[in-house]
A protein has these predicted regions:
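A conserved active-site cap/scaffold subdomain adjacent to cofactor or substrate pockets
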Residues: 1-11
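Conserved C-terminal structural/oligomerization subdomain of aldehyde/semialdehyde dehydrogenase
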Residues: 14-144
């Protein structure tokens, strides 16, 4: 954790250039692989090989473990994107982009890392933490 991809690769006995920024490990069809089951806080990405989009969505549901936080898909098929978004039912769902796009980094939304996303309230903004007030006037200022 917290190491460059090249440092991690060399520790594993793999020779890569210093400019290497990402390591992709092919875990084939093993959804029980430690890299598939554990959040990676390093530049190592597991590659799972599903037979089709339905199996990939099924695996994503298993691996997300019902946390309802974040999921995403890269696809040109809008039906597949819709199918996965509905199945995952996460607070943040990103189509064809990095997951940080859901927090305003190249996408839409606000950059707010709070506990609100997995509990269903969604992302927060400054307005989430202030008292909203309503002012109402009766009779006067009625312009017809």
């Amino acid at each position: 954790m917290g190491r460059d991809a090249a440092v991690i690769a060399r520790a594993a006995g793999i020779d890569v250039p210093d400019s290497c920024r990402l390591l992709i490990i092919d875990v084939k069809r093993d959804i029980d692989h430690v890299f598939a089951r554990t959040e990676q806080l390093m530049p190592v990405v597991p590659l799972l090989r599903a037979k089709d989009v339905d199996e990939a969505i099924e695996w994503a549901l298993i691996l997300e473990r019902g946390l309802s936080h974040t999921a995403g898909i890269h696809s040109r098929n809008i039906d597949n994107m819709d199918k996965m978004a509905r199945a995952m039912n996460t607070s943040l769902f990103v189509k064809n982009g990095p997951h940080l796009a859901a927090l305003g980094a190249g996408g839409e939304g606000w950059t707010t890392m709070t506990i609100s996303t997995p509990t269903g309230e969604g992302v927060t903004c400054a307005r989430s933490f202030v008292r909203l007030r309503r002012c109402c006037v009766v009779d006067n200022f009625r312009i017809v």
